[in-house]
């Protein structure tokens, strides 16, 4: 897709024909359906595939594959066929393949949308740990509020344009306006709204669940 106007910069580089190869090497992508990304006969082979294409020396490649699988908790499955894994395990392998390439940026395109709630939360936590350990930029394209809550910055897209740029707290404080953006209202924001209607006083429209728990205890102690 070509830009209509202006310039695009990624990690300080302007995107053009001369820089596109270097920029591609800076980015790893994990898609919604991991089955569409698997090419190796085993988990280990699949994680190594991109490294082989780049001509990474064998010893370094083996070390990277081992480290990436350890990071996502899939070392014990190195010799398994990807097709025999669960949905959550497949996504972990796909993320390991991206991490092994040592990108500066990882793009997650609805990467947790096909998982059950437990698998989704586990994968989100894994991504957070990887981000913190490697200081990577993670761009997550998602409708999942748990993912949004862990982000530093949220860009809301509406009809192909940036509707807003804010912190998760600022976004969630918009209450029922979120529904018009195709998003759900967080549980804590819903509960605060209900409690306000019943006469309880809150200074915020949104709190994290831990903050809400603390404030509810304060309200109960005052009652």
Residue ranges and their predicted role:
Residues 102:
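Conserved catalytic motifs of ABC-family nucleotide-binding domains
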Residues 59-77:
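Conserved ABC ATPase "signature" region
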Residues 106-109:
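Catalytic Walker B motif of ABC-type/P-loop ATPase nucleotide-binding domains
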Residues 81-85, 89:
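Conserved ABC ATPase signature
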Residues 3-14, 23:
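Conserved ABC transporter NBD signature motif
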Residues 178-223:
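ABC ATPase nucleotide-binding domains
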């Amino acid at each position: 897709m070509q830009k209509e106007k202006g310039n695009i910069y990624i990690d300080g580089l302007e995107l053009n024909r001369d820089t596109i190869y270097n920029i591609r090497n800076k980015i790893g992508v994990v898609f919604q359906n991991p089955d569409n990304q698997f090419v190796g006969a085993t988990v280990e082979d699949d994680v190594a595939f991109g490294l082989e294409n780049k001509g990474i020396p064998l010893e370094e490649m083996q070390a990277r594959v081992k480290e990436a699988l350890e990071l996502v908790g899939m070392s014990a499955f190195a010799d398994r066929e990807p097709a025999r894994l669960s949905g959550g395990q497949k996504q972990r392998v796909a993320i390991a393949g991206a991490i092994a390439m040592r990108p500066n940026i990882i793009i997650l395109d609805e990467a947790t949308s096909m998982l059950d709630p437990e698998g989704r939360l586990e994968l989100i936590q894994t991504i957070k740990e990887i981000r913190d350990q490697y200081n990577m930029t993670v761009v997550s394209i998602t409708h999942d509020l748990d993912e949004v809550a862990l982000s530093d910055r949220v860009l809301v897209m509406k009809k192909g344009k940036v509707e807003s740029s804010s912190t998760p707290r600022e976004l969630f404080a918009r209450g029922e306006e979120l529904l018009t953006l195709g998003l759900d209202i967080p549980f804590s924001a819903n509960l605060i709204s209900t409690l306000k209607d019943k006469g309880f006083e809150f200074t915020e429209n949104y709190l994290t669940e831990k903050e809400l728990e603390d404030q509810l205890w304060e309200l109960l102690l005052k009652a």
